[in-house]
């Protein structure tokens, strides 16, 4: 495999080209990209966990250091002022010397407020991208050039097309997440609580709870019906029925986002339903290709959901077409089939149809779908179908003309299992789709 250093060199060349184009289009001289700052908890003296500006970590794999600055103009070597204070209260990261530092000019910044004297004197035509607009104003950046929408839309659109460096980082993140999922399944099988399963996951991935790209969803039994369940019970339930784990990892700022669901027993209806959702998810991925709208795959999976609802006699006496047409599949899969993935878990530009930021909303019938793009080579997306038994979504169907088609007895029997979600991360290539998750043999 090509070294990360050579992949990074090409990555920087791509970012430089995008920057030149953006600066020319919006008549700017350079971009000043801020890693961010620490923000204290209200009325307290300690900060919230630091989360770096995604536009900053697109350039350099520096994810834990606030008060850093990048100056890029698309021509000259990117200039990084790296925050390096004299501080005996807190850990101070050393000046970087890694695979990427040959391609970036790295300069120590001893004082957070010292950046002003180091920037070019003429700043009226520099754009600021970062989370602290007031800092940009203090530096003399024009208000109209602070997080300029056109520039950000342009950069976001092209972030959809991953460089080979980015794909290499995402494959490494996959490896970490797969290790975590295997450790978590083992913890579940041994009867651990959600809290302890989460600890097992973090240990296996080498992450702290604040390092994972999103809060781990560690859901036993009926908790799997809460789509973003993050409570983490300390006590294991008396009876283990099911386990849904939606948890990722991060490598050089790039995310993995995987979900698996396990049944405690292998010989019940729920276990068969888990197997069937998994099979249908793989079957859908096998049909994916460049040039097709992501929306089409979402709609196709509702047809697959209908097939499973019929097979398992959860919905009866109704054709699969009628189920989808009348949205009887909706309460069972209330979220989208997935989303773009990259520097952010819900990566940017899912609705953007061009580099001017033209927005195409999700279909009215499926408002929670996070992507309406035509799939193109270089895109990375999640494919994460599910079937859930959520009373608040099922309740409206208990009355009315369609109620008789719901096998309420079967639904009540499945509700204690919560739900099912299976999620892989896929790369769209010119002539094939790469399933980064299954390539690592995660069942």
Curated annotation (Swiss-Prot):
GO MF annotations in UniProt: aminopeptidase activity; metal ion binding; metalloexopeptidase activity; phosphoric triester hydrolase activity; proline dipeptidase activity
Cofactors: Mn(2+)
Pfam family, one: Peptidase_M24
Chain sites annotated for binding Mn(2+) 1: 257, 339, 384, 423
Any one biological process term the GO annotation gives: proteolysis
Residues where Mn(2+) 2 binds: 246, 257, 423
Protein origin, superkingdom: Bacteria
Annotated cofactor note: Binds 2 manganese ions per subunit.
Catalyzed reactions: Xaa-L-Pro dipeptide + H2O = an L-alpha-amino acid + L-proline
Keywords: Dipeptidase, Hydrolase, Manganese, Metal-binding, Metalloprotease, Protease
A cellular-component GO term for this protein: cytosol
EC number: 3.4.13.9
Functional summary from the UniProt entry: Splits dipeptides with a prolyl residue in the C-terminal position.
Family: Belongs to the peptidase M24B family. Bacterial-type prolidase subfamily.
Protein name: Xaa-Pro dipeptidase
Gene that encodes it: pepQ
